[in-house]
Amino acid sequence: MRIALCSYSQKEKETALLMKLGKVDRFDNGVFCTYAMQRDGPYDAVVVMEDGARGMNFCMSIRGYSRDVPLLWISDQAEFEPQSRRMQADTFLVM
């Protein structure tokens, strides 16, 4: 399984958990993730671990390139749930 983790800040616990699932590539922004998908092919899943507008921008970059890749947005701001639907995130989790 090939997973893209988009997170500006390093969250070691979450990253370690995801790395157990398979190959994880970490990106500081959605644009770099999009470049990697163009260069190396699609990911099995993209996980955005950013809050608020930054997370929304990550999702916009990913969805601008691919509507098919499963997209999980993890945030601590529940008020961004409507934006997650608009960005067509497959799952929005509040932690």
Model-identified regions with their sequence ranges:
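Hydrophobic/aromatic residues located in beta-strands of well-ordered beta-sheets
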Residues: 3, 71-72
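Two-component/phosphorelay signaling modules centered on CheY-like receiver
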Residues: 5-32
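Conserved active-site segment of CheY-like receiver
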Residues: 7-8, 73-78
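Short, charged/polar "capping" segments at the starts of alpha-helices
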Residues: 10-16, 53-55, 79-83
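Short, structured coil segments at secondary-structure junctions
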Residues: 20, 67, 87-88
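Conserved phosphotransfer microenvironments
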Residues: 33-34, 42-66, 77-78
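Two-component signal transduction core modules
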Residues: 46, 71, 92-94
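Alpha4 helix (beta4-alpha4-beta5 surface) of REC/receiver domains from two-component response regulators
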Residues: 57, 76-93
